[in-house]
Amino acid sequence: METVSRSSFQPHAGLQKTLEQFHLSSMSSLGGPAAFSARWTQDLYKKECGKEPPEPILHLPSQPPPVIPGGPLFMPSDRSTERCETILEGETISCFVVGGEKRLCLPQILNSVLRDFSLQQINAVCDELHVYCSRCTADQLEILKVMGILPFSAPSCGLITKTDAERLCNALMYGGSYPPRCAKKSDFPPGPLELELTEGSFKVYHECFGKCRGLFVPELYGHPSAPCIQCLDCRLMYPPHKFVVHSHKALENRTCHWGFDSANWRAYILLARDGVGGDDELARLGRLLEEIKEKFDYSNKYKRKAARLSSEPVAKKAKADDSIIHSPSSAEKDKSSSWLRNLSNINKNAGYVHPRQRLSAFRPWSPAISANDKELSTHLPALIRDSFYNYKSFENLVAPNVALTPPVQQKVITSPPCVPAVPRSTQSSGSPPQSRKRRPTAELPIVPEAPAPPVPIREEEKESETEIEVESREECTFTSSLSSLSSPSFTSSSSAKELSSPGMLAPTVINTSYEVASHNDQHCSGLEAELEHLKQALDSGLDSKEAKEKFLHEVVKMRVKQEEKLNAALQAKRSLQQELEFLRVAKKEKLREATEAKRNLRKEIERLRAEHEKKMKEANESRLRLKRELEQARQIRVCDKGCEAGRIRVKYSAQIEELQSKLQHAENDREQLRTDLVHEREAREHLEKVVKDLQEQLWSKTSHLPSSEHTRKDIEN
């Protein structure tokens, strides 16, 4: 387990100067806010006030500062691919958490929240506010495509921070302007844009995006989105979460804003001190503002935060009768490293801070040094263990994308395992709170400490320490006051040797070293010093030598049990590390399989799309061909109809002419037959006449009757 003492680390002068320069430059850069602004703003406020309160000092012997190689190391930017969602103007937007700041998908914002605005308007506002749009990585682009947020044909995607998205939406959708009757020196009579002065109204302000002052009207705060704050510049009413974005000054357009969220307006709106009668009135308005902030706080975040702040005491001053006197060199050294101690206490101390200490309301909180009401236990393992967790919290405070090179050597100062119970007034007020109280078994004289050898820092342990520190801490908690005498590298064989050694009777002080938890346990040389302190306790509290030996044997047994517990905890830690590594490998494998499946799916979709386009092209060509054939058939049909009528007309005309000719021939034949009949009638009449003449001749010739009959028959024939 890593044992890095927060108080023993002494910063190099060049490193401290580099950190101060980084703090000044990071306010206007894209790397995030200054993570080291807490102590810097406190020193600035103390210099302005002209008084320097006493700082809490851990009473440790002086030692030379370690060698710090080089300056800051700028590491690669955070390329996180874990997709999450956030709410922006009532719309759910996909985002990635990069460097602690949410990066929102810009195309999704344009298509949902800002769909009523043109690209020219959006670009103009982005140029005015200096909104920076970064390009997403290839993995982030693939995730957005797989989730269906972006089309597969999208070549890239822009990402903007949640803070810039809030500023952009506020400027486009809720941008206030100066009404014609809101000038500071106006000669117009009072109108509807006057201040909403009521009995409970009071002035507030915020320091976000250039600052703004307003008048809070509690009577109008009927629901979370009620416009209850009136801007003192434009006289327009805004709800609290919109007032913190509202501003009429372009003072911070070139500042990198980081970590802003309008949902946290309760932390941004502050009470204005001008126009307040006295301290009582100021306290009353402060309580009223706190009550208003707790109203409609459904998640109870602000209530929990306020309760946590009120439960911790304010920093106490050291009493004048302090019996411990520090040398000028140690005081100077503690003063130079005070900024590091305060940084490690940020997660534990959150006392009251004067508003002048904060340059902006949404920048990291600058806590004052608060005193701990618990008793201080100076036992080294517990101190190192708590310092280790504070060191881990200190690592998380570094600004995103920027890391500092760790020192090559870090030293830990040992302390006696048992110290006499001292009054609270003589304890250090700035000591980190322990996990539990420990009662010393006997009154012991204070033994001077000796510097410890350097402790190596293993990079492989730093990587996985964050994931399992909670489990390791639960398994490694000590269950009694005597159990705090154990060390990670103690063994039963060495303890037996020390018990049988006659040199135990001589009071000696041995240097001890505490190593970082690793795969190979090393023997510790601090057993002699601890047993010497135990002998002093036995000499002062036990009479017989047998009782002392029995007490020492009990202590050794207890330490062996604790070592077994520690080994079991280390084994559990290793197993958890292996399981975590297995989960990481499995996650990478699943991600690779998902990526491969996505690529195959995309290829299949592209193939189906190509086939569909080909079939659609063929269908369109077939449709056009059939359409042309249909038109040709229609034209042919129309032509055929016209030609057939002509042919029928010609045919019928020919037939009519033929019939007419036939009729003419028939008429001619009829005339010819009529003529023939006339000729035949005439011939018949002539014949009848001849016959009649012959009959007459026959009648006249009666004598020749047979011959005449025969002649008549011949004539008839």
Swiss-Prot record:
High levels of the protein are found in the lungs and ovary with intermediate levels of expression in the heart, spleen and brain. Low expression levels are found in the liver, kidney, testis, intestine and blood while no expression is found in muscle, skin, stomach, eyes or nerves. Residues 527-625 are annotated as: 4 X 25 AA approximate tandem repeats. Residues 415-502, 698-717 are annotated as: Disordered. SUPFAM superfamilies: Putative DNA-binding domain (SSF46955), SAND domain-like (SSF63763). It is found in: Nucleus. Residues 524-700 form a coiled coil. Residues 477-495 have a biased composition (Low complexity). Sequence repeats lie at residues 527-550, 551-575, 576-600, 601-625. Residues 707-717 have a biased composition (Basic and acidic residues). One of its GO terms (molecular function) is DNA-binding transcription factor activity, RNA polymerase II-specific. May play a role in terminal differentiation of skeletal muscle cells but not in the determination of cells to the myogenic lineage. May function in TGF-beta signaling. Belongs to the SKI family. This is Ski oncogene. It comes from Xenopus laevis.
